[in-house]
Amino acid sequence: VLAEKRSLGSRDGPPHLVVLVPLHSKAAAHNTLRLLQSQDSAVVRVDEGKAGGFALLCPRLKQRWRFVTAEAGDLHAVLDLAKVADSLLFILDPADGWDSAGEHCLSCLFAQGLPSYALAVPGGTDLPPKKRIDARKKLARAIEKRFPDAKLFPLTTEQESSLLLRHLATQKQRHLAFRDRRAHLLAYAAEFVPGEESDLVGTLKVSGFVRGQTLDVNSLVHIVGHGDFQMSQVDSPPDPLSLNPRVIKGQKRSQDMEVQDDSVNGTDEMEEDVKVLMKADPNKQESLQSEVVPDPMEGEQTWPTEEELQEAE
């Protein structure tokens, strides 16, 4: 358990993948993102073209996180992200906690399997002091039914967001059997290379951090919504979220927070200093055939011989 805690989010392990799940239509997820990005002596890498996605690199704490925001109302996306997330960060409304859509989302997550999680309540400072206390008590009663031992983290200051990050980094990871038995990843970058014969058939290059079991190049890989495919090889590209990022001259990284935009596509980084780890062996590759091909001659019967008729009598 201790080794697992130390490897997750460290230099030698994959970044701590945190998925933000708003449970109320009024939940201020953007305020949560802003506070998480305001950490001192931290580097923020914004995912280009992905709303609400960024990586937080903190060399001082020797930790790195990747935050992805699930679209509110897209239940299938929430469930798919929960399959690969190290932690879920539920964003609650200060007054009501979660609405009917959030309740349905929680029921589906509990049925699928809930990974490690944390509860955050951004805002709430606009309420009068008395109503604020009443709302906090009401929210605590509602949380106790769904999450008996959970701690509620208010998010109004940078210090409170630091406490939340520390909790995410140190809490015990919950194990889910269906993903501990398999290798899985959330794609960081993807590129389709068309084949020579047809533009519709080619090779898909996917870059990401492998979690769970060791990835076997001869096994099949499942892409959500598209099916099963064979792999040709597994490469080791440079780490796009290194804890020692490139420092721009003239800027003090120790004092100012540096926000970097991933203007360079991650697939371009895959082409630089790529090391081939494994190549598929056609004799050992798992077949894509998932159903038995019927043999029309399998059920054919021959006329019994004289000896067989005598034995039957």
Per-region residue spans from a language model:
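Canonical P-loop GTPase G-domain recognition
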Residues: 110-217, 222
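Short acidic, S/G/P-rich loop/turn micro-motifs used as interaction or catalytic elements
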Residues: 25-28, 92-99, 125-128
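Intrinsically disordered, low-complexity regions enriched in proline, serine, glycine
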Residues: 30, 100-101, 130-131, 152-155, ...
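Helical mechanochemical/support elements of P-loop NTPase systems and associated helical scaffolds
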Residues: 16, 28, 81-84, 101-105, ...
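C-terminal effector/interaction modules appended to NTPase cores
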Residues: 1-86, 196-313
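Inter-motif core of Ras-like GTPase G domains
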Residues: 71-96, 102-119
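A generic secondary-structure signal
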Residues: 35, 39, 107-108, 142
